[in-house]
Amino acid sequence: IDFADHFIRPNYSADLTDLNGSLGAFSSVAQAGAPQMADLVLTGRAEGSAALDVRGKLNPLATPLALDIQAKVSDLDLPPLSPYSVKYAGHGIERGKLSMDVGYKILPDGQLTASNKLVLNQLEFGDAVPGAPASLPVQLATALLADSDGVIDLDLPISGSLNDPQFSLGPIIFKAIINLIGKAITAPFTLL
């Protein structure tokens, strides 16, 4: 599968290969008050090197969407994701790899609980891109968050009600990242 995102400039594209998967039966008719969940298994590779594994249960016809899935990606090269980092941080990615282990669960009442474990290995940003919509101090943040081996280990839990009109993932993720940077900045002082 050739994935392309034409909403970002420059455009982003990714090659998904060796895809294998199955999705069990599901129904729009709720049984015993809960939507019938289908078993989901999807494996493959992204960009030829990153292993992809998604497993769990879901019902795409339920309102709100009902799911309980876990997904893992290992060793995804980050430089091809530079269009996103330029848009949101003002810097391209020179090198680095991402591994992640995430879990998302949405209950019938719309309550979302998510775990996001991200490991960034040897992440290096380039210079600020002139004219980029944003410019964040990503080199400083990377230096503060990385351990002595150049590994950044992030744990970003998320929860909230999808039925709440004020609920949005963007501010929650932004707040979690700001808290991580704040902890990284104060961490050297805890050693004194």
What does each model-found stretch correspond to?
Residues 2-164, 170-192:
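Small-residue helix/turn framework positions
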